[in-house]
Amino acid sequence: MTETHNDPEELARRVASLSAQNERLAQILVEARSKIVGLQQQIDDLAQPPSTYATFIRSYSDGTADVMVQGRKMRLTSLPAAMVSTARPGQQVRLNEAMAIVETMTYDHTGELVTVKELIGTHRAMVVGRGDDERVVNLAGSLIGRDGPTIRTGDSVLVDLKAGYALEKIDKSEVEELVLEEVPRVAYEDIGGLSRQIDTIKDAVELPFLHPDLYREHGLKAPKGILLYGPPGCGKTLIAKAVAHSLAQTVGQGNNTPTDDTRGYFLNIKGPELLNKYVGETERQIRLIFTRARDKAAQGHPVVVFFDEMESLFRTRGTGLSSDVETTIVPQLLAEIDGVERLDNVIVIGASNREDMIDPAILRPGRLDVKIKIERPDAEAALDIFSKYLTPDLPIHPVDLAEHGGNAQDAVTAMGQRVVEHMYATTPDNQFLEVTYASGDKETLYFKDFSSGAMIQNIVDRAKKAAIKGYLSHGTRGLQVEHLLAACDDEFQENEDLPNTTNPDDWARISGKKGERIVFIRTIVQRKGEGKNPTPAKAIETPHNTGPYL
């Protein structure tokens, strides 16, 4: 009989148990060793001295590089030597305790914001910082493309003044407002009621681009600018956009390129946007506008610089009616228009409803050569404008369609005629104002005397809204002529209290009623169905010698 400890099966179990214990101990030992290595690495990391960062300038074939360290220019060794061969000027590099380059980093994203005043060659620029302090800085590699610098005069850039590098272009909201926008697709055919003015603009603007040889042969220059003046809401801005679009097409035809691919640019400048409390800031922005315009024009693109509300910026100098900031703003615009640098492919268009307040030096021939009055639409022009908004593709009420044999075009044409007849009728219901002139003569003005393209568009929009509400209420779809007539009456009633009776002479200039001075005004609107009396007359006292503030 054998002993238990000599049993082979028992020995095999003990061997297997000891092997498992050995494996567990080996695994624990490996884990302990890795933890010791990790802790040792942490100890080594904590014991390392802090790294220094520098700005890379240039590298050399021997593996050294020039860097700027805290305002000091130094030549250091790179580890490895080939690492700095791919670094670009202005880039950050990391240095070890021995002042050797051990790693290349990205560009710094913080610094001082300055404005580019002038580019010097392909790798430097003159910039203006706080307090008009001028500095010359190098351009980082991120600002230099294949064809040269990717920045231009007027751009805001981030600079590291200690290293002397411009690092990044920053798009400020102020500059974004002045960025050239592409021309909207507004054609002359989209404008109603201004055919005569459009013909005048075509002769003044398009002929020099279509027939430059004839102009040179006759010693004639293209006009530098156009002034569009007239009452509000009559299409001045719309015409300016159409001019830009037409110029782009004309230049495209002259270059034998498809007109759809021809890009024109329209820079819409609203006068109050440029006004700034800091002396010289408005003039700087005007220079920036024309610099951007010249850049695009030099590439063969036509550029329209449109000044809306022109009288707010370029008011007559020396009148004492404002803070007299125009004493320097007006000469700046004149310098840009008449300056040494030619404005080829650039045309200046100004729009104003108070052209009498614009400085005469701007309006003289040779600057704003063409002056076009945008008048209020008469009945024929109003019908043309209605045809732009009342189109056959609109849902028409079955009753109106039936009256014209189901022809949608005839139906909308008849609608336009009905509402125009209603608008331009000289009936007591359409009487608006009674004005008294300085001579004692009186004149009754009707709502038709104050119509505009914007008013006509608003009437159509009101009618469309009424048609939608009618469909939701009664389930009958379509636009009716009654909707248009009711919208016209609502538009008239809303305008009843709008005339400015405090200073009727200024109001008359803005509204387009020029002529003899108005001294007395009263509204005589008859409100239908309300039984209300006309607004009582109100005398107007015009003060004299009130000083420059009234």
Swiss-Prot record:
Annotated Gene Ontology cellular component terms: proteasome complex
PROSITE patterns hit by this protein: AAA (PS00674)
GO molecular function ontology, one term from the record: ATP hydrolysis activity
Residues covered by region (Docks into pockets in the proteasome alpha-ring): 549-550
Binding site for ATP: G233, C234, G235, K236, T237, L238
Gene Ontology biological process: modification-dependent protein catabolic process; proteasomal protein catabolic process
Pfam families in alphabetical order: AAA, Prot_ATP_ID_OB_C, Prot_ATP_ID_OB_N
Keyword match Chaperone: yes
InterPro entries from the UniProt entry: AAA+_ATPase, AAA_ATPase_domain, ATPase_AAA_core, ATPase_AAA_CS, NA-bd_OB-fold, P-loop_NTPase, Prot_ATP_ID_OB_2nd, Prot_ATP_ID_OB_N
Chain's role: ATPase which is responsible for recognizing, binding, unfolding and translocation of pupylated proteins into the bacterial 20S proteasome core particle. May be essential for opening the gate of the 20S proteasome via an interaction with its C-terminus, thereby allowing substrate entry and access to the site of proteolysis. Thus, the C-termini of the proteasomal ATPase may function like a 'key in a lock' to induce gate opening and therefore regulate proteolysis.
Free-text comment about domains: Consists of three main regions, an N-terminal coiled-coil domain that binds to protein Pup and functions as a docking station, an interdomain involved in ARC hexamerization, and a C-terminal ATPase domain of the AAA type.
Known partners and oligomeric status: Homohexamer. Assembles into a hexameric ring structure that caps the 20S proteasome core. Strongly interacts with the prokaryotic ubiquitin-like protein Pup through a hydrophobic interface; the interacting region of ARC lies in its N-terminal coiled-coil domain. There is one Pup binding site per ARC hexamer ring. Upon ATP-binding, the C-terminus of ARC interacts with the alpha-rings of the proteasome core, possibly by binding to the intersubunit pockets.
Name of this chain's protein: Proteasome-associated ATPase
Organism: Jonesia denitrificans (strain ATCC 14870 / DSM 20603 / BCRC 15368 / CIP 55.134 / JCM 11481 / NBRC 15587 / NCTC 10816 / Prevot 55134) (Listeria denitrificans)
Name of the coding gene: arc
